[in-house]
Design a protein with these regions (language model features):
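Conserved alpha-helical positions within TPR/SEL1-like repeat arrays
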Residues: 13-24, 47-54
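Non-heme Fe(II)/2-oxoglutarate
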Residues: 98-189
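Residue-level recognition of tetratricopeptide repeat
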Residues: 11, 45, 77-80
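Catalytic core of non-heme Fe(II) oxygenases with the double-stranded beta-helix
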Residues: 164-167, 171, 175-256
Length: 256
C-alpha cells in the first residue's frame, strides 16, 4: 500500500487499506493517521470514518472520539460499528449519545434451532466437511482465536452446491428475522439494506478453545451457526455458548 501511495499520493483507498493493515498490526496511532489522510482526500468516505471512530476508541482518545461520533450522528450514519461504539462509549465514559442503529440491541437477539427445521446433517455437517476438503480453502491467522483455526476469505465466494445450500437457508432465516421485527422503529430494521451479500467462514476449535469478544465491522447483521458441538457435562452446560453483550469486559466506566 505504501508503494501504491508513492505512485498515486491522492489514492484515498490506499491510505484506508494501509490503515487497516496497521490496525491488524496493533499500530493504532499510525492507523489513525492513515484514516485521516484517506478522509482528507475523500471527505465522504464513510467506511474510513467508521474505522477512524474505532481507532480513536481503542486509543482512548476521548475528545477526538466524541467529535468523530458526533460527526457521524449528525450525518445520520446508521451502521453496526457506530451503534456498537455508541453503547461502548456510554459504558466506558458515562456519556450517552443517540444510538441511530439500535437502542436496545439485546432485544434483537434471536435463537433458532435449525436442526428442527432443515436436514442439518446434509446441509451443514456434510457441507462443512466438503468445504474444508476443497483445495481452494485455506486457513488464516486469527489473533482473536485460541487453540483453533479459521478459514480465510469468504466461503460464499466459492460457488458449489454445498455453499449454495447453506446460503439458501441463511437468506431464508434472515428474511424471517426481518419480518419478525418489521414494525420496529430501530435503524437496524428501518434502514435495512435493499440488497446484501453474505460473508462467512468456518472456525474449528479444540478442547479449551476460545474466541475473544469482537464485532464484525463490515456487517449489518451477524450470526453464528454451531455445526458440531461435542456433548457437554451438565456442570459445564454453558461451555462453548455464544455470548452477546453491549461491550467488552474492559469497557468499564472511566472515573478520571
Amino acid at each position: 500500500y505504501r508503494q501504491s501511495i508513492v505512485l498515486k499520493p491522492d489514492h484515498a483507498e490506499a491510505y484506508f487499506s494501509l490503515g487497516n493493515t496497521l490496525r491488524e498490526l496493533v499500530r493504532e496511532e499510525e492507523a489513525e493517521t492513515s484514516y485521516r489522510q484517506a478522509i482528507a482526500l475523500k471527505p465522504d468516505y464513510t467506511v474510513a470514518h467508521n474505522h477512524l471512530l474505532s481507532c480513536l476508541y481503542l486509543l482512548d482518545k476521548r475528545s477526538p472520539f466524541f467529535d468523530q461520533l458526533d460527526y457521524l450522528i449528525s450525518k445520520d450514519e446508521v451502521n453496526a460499528v457506530v451503534g456498537s461504539l455508541t453503547w461502548r462509549s456510554a459504558l466506558k465514559y458515562g456519556v450517552e449519545k443517540p444510538n441511530l442503529f439500535c437502542k436496545e440491541p439485546l432485544e434483537y437477539v434471536s435463537h433458532i434451532d435449525l436442526s428442527s427445521k432443515y436436514n442439518f446433517e446434509e446441509i451443514f455437517v456434510e457441507s462443512a466437511k466438503s468445504i474444508l476438503n476443497d483445495e481452494r480453502v485455506s486457513n488464516r491467522q486469527q489473533s482473536l482465536l485460541v487453540n483453533g483455526y479459521q478459514t480465510s476469505g469468504n466461503l460464499f465466494s466459492i460457488e458449489n452446491d454445498f455453499t449454495e445450500k447453506i446460503q439458501k437457508v441463511i437468506r431464508s432465516e434472515i428474511e424471517k428475522y426481518r419480518v419478525n421485527f418489521k414494525d420496529s422503529e430501530e435503524g437496524l430494521i428501518k434502514k435495512w439494506p435493499t440488497d446484501y451479500s453474505l460473508y462467512g467462514w468456518l472456525i474449528s476449535m479444540k478442547s479449551g478453545g476460545e474466541l475473544y469478544p469482537h464485532i464484525h465491522e463490515q456487517g449489518w447483521l451477524s450470526g453464528t451457526i454451531y455445526i458440531n458441538v461435542p456433548p457437554k457435562p451438565r456442570s459445564k452446560a454453558d461451555n462453548g455458548n455464544l455470548v452477546v453483550s453491549l461491550g467488552h469486559d474492559h469497557d468499564a466506566t472511566d472515573t478520571d
